[in-house]
Amino acid sequence: MYRTHYSSEITEELNGQKVKVAGWVWEVKDLGGIKFLWIRDRDGIVQITAPKKKVDPELFKLIPKLRSEDVVAVEGVVNFTPKAKLGFEILPEKIVVLNRAETPLPLDPTGKVKAELDTRLDNRFMDLRRPEVMAIFKIRSSVFKAVRDFFHENGFIEIHTPKIIATATEGGTELFPMKYFEEDAFLAQSPQLYKQIMMASGLDRVYEIAPIFRAEEHNTTRHLNEAWSIDSEMAFIEDEEEVMSFLERLVAHAINYVREHNAKELDILNFELEEPKLPFPRVSYDKALEILGDLGKEIPWGEDIDTEGERLLGKYMMENENAPLYFLYQYPSEAKPFYIMKYDNKPEICRAFDLEYRGVEISSGGQREHRHDILVEQIKEKGLNPESFEFYLKAFRYGMPPHGGFGLGAERLIKQMLDLPNIREVILFPRDRRRLTP
């Protein structure tokens, strides 16, 4: 065993005890009669202090020969002292060089020499050695844990749906085609139809966390062609408000979990994550258009709110409501997919919503149309053929309860939570319009 403790696990209780630490060389300093070595692991930095009179001569000679990012393991005695930068040091008895790093490095993991995003993504393994990048992905891990725990605490069952499908989930054309033996198939852009089918099964409350694939040619700071979606569906709801209420509590739980468990990472990022206030404001589509009109942005009724409109609304909600998170709801039916339920007394309006975070849509959802005949008509209204959806419609003929749900973009949630400039910062190996490797 090369390691008994991570840097974060070395506490005063270990003072005077022997430990093993391992990681990458961060810095070496030679002061003649004393040499210093700092090594980095995933939790931080450890200082190795080697006074000439107290360490093996061969070990003393080895330290200045180490290069940045060499992989080493150190065995030694913990010494807590105010003289050490970090409050403690390790007096080495043994240093093993596990591997050498070539020079020059593809980028500087200390961050002193800046690198373009493309260079960083091409060398993601090295990029992650930067503490601020490591912090982002530790937070990402916490978000996924918090979300999964919250679903289970609220009686949801995890499901896994196909990612190779025969027909477009929402009738869109933004699908990646593929050959499935002798047939044409596509990569799934959403588990929408399958999670609705599950509402007829009696599972009642389901969720899935899985990749989705969208052949959108957008090359922006908020789009990916492969992303992770947090999807949910719940049966026996009376209206879309029940779904919105659950979603806001889920998002608030994830944010608060990060606040509680990732204080160190937030400090590394120099970011203060505010506690979300429940309930999130609800802004109707009509009210949103009115606000935008007052801001000089005119959107014809029935059209979706574009990127600039979202940005302006986000700024307005922060300045006037101090609300980074808010819902847009009561959308025109023509702007939303066929499976969204319309208001019976006002069919031009539907029971759909979007959740916005700092002016970017992170989730869409709503109450679904559970009545078979009406659903068939809505499919036709969108210019689609109901026969293509027979596998889906079949579930609606044998007792489908009222239901609703949402899809929440994991990367968008994390990007907006940390107020990062680019969605590629929060996914290890982005797939976008130009990037297929690494």
Curated annotation (Swiss-Prot):
Effect the entry attributes to changing W26H: Gains the ability to form Asp-tRNA(Asn) in vitro. Only 2-fold decrease in catalytic efficiency for Asp-tRNA(Asp) synthesis
Top-level class of the enzyme under EC nomenclature: ligase
Molecular-function GO terms, alphabetical: aspartate-tRNA ligase activity; ATP binding; magnesium ion binding; RNA binding
Catalytic reactions on record: tRNA(Asp) + L-aspartate + ATP = L-aspartyl-tRNA(Asp) + AMP + diphosphate
Stretches the record annotates as Aspartate: 192-195
Positions contributing to Mg(2+) 2 binding: E361, S364
Assigned EC number: 6.1.1.12
Cofactor(s) needed by this chain: Mg(2+)
CDD domains, per database record: AsxRS_core, ND_PkAspRS_like_N
Annotated thermal dependence: Optimum temperature is 60 degrees Celsius.
Amino acids binding L-aspartate: E170, R214, S364, R368
InterPro entries (alphabetical): Aa-tRNA-synt_II, aa-tRNA-synth_II, aa-tRNA-synth_II/BPL/LPL, Asp-tRNA_synthase_2, Asp/Asn-tRNA-synth_IIb, NA-bd_OB-fold, NA-bd_OB_tRNA
Binding sites annotated in the UniProt record for ATP: R214, A215, E216, R222, H223, L224, E361, G409, A410, E411, R412
GO cellular component: aminoacyl-tRNA synthetase multienzyme complex; cytosol
Record flagged with keyword Electron transport: no
Binding site for Mg(2+) 3: E361
Function: Catalyzes the attachment of L-aspartate to tRNA(Asp) in a two-step reaction: L-aspartate is first activated by ATP to form Asp-AMP and then transferred to the acceptor end of tRNA(Asp). Is specific for tRNA(Asp) since it aspartylates tRNA(Asn) 3 orders of magnitude less efficiently than tRNA(Asp).
Protein family: Belongs to the class-II aminoacyl-tRNA synthetase family. Type 2 subfamily.
PANTHER family to which the protein is assigned, alphabetical: ASPARTATE--TRNA LIGASE, CYTOPLASMIC, ASPARTYL-TRNA SYNTHETASE
The name this protein goes by in its record: Aspartate--tRNA(Asp) ligase
Organism: Thermococcus kodakarensis (strain ATCC BAA-918 / JCM 12380 / KOD1) (Pyrococcus kodakaraensis (strain KOD1))
